[in-house]
């Protein structure tokens, strides 16, 4: 998945019935999950938006993805 220049992984836990992932190519941990594909995508977008808002609030430069 891609959003605002960030790439996210997609995995599935059969035992929990949950899709999950994390943003790739940066050191900060940005994770997300959902019980459906749409929930996963929505949570991925929200996680990236929350990360960018936090960086702005703290006055720090957000990490950008390395060449993945």
What are these model-predicted stretches?
Residues 1-7, 16, 38, 42-68:
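Short, charged, surface-exposed hinge/linker loops at domain edges
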Residues 12-27:
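Short aromatic-glycine-(Arg/Gly/Cys) micro-motifs in beta-strand/loop hairpins
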Residues 27-39:
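A short, exposed loop/beta-hairpin motif centered on an aromatic-Gly-Thr core
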């Amino acid at each position: 998945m891609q959003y605002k220049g960030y790439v996210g992984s997609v995995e599935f836990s059969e035992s929990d019935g949950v899709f999950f992932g994390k943003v790739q190519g940066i050191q900060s941990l940005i994770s997300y999950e959902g019980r459906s594909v749409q929930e996963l995508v929505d949570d991925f977008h929200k996680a990236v938006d929350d990360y960018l808002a936090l960086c702005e609030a703290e006055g720090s430069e957000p990490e950008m993805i390395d060449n993945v």
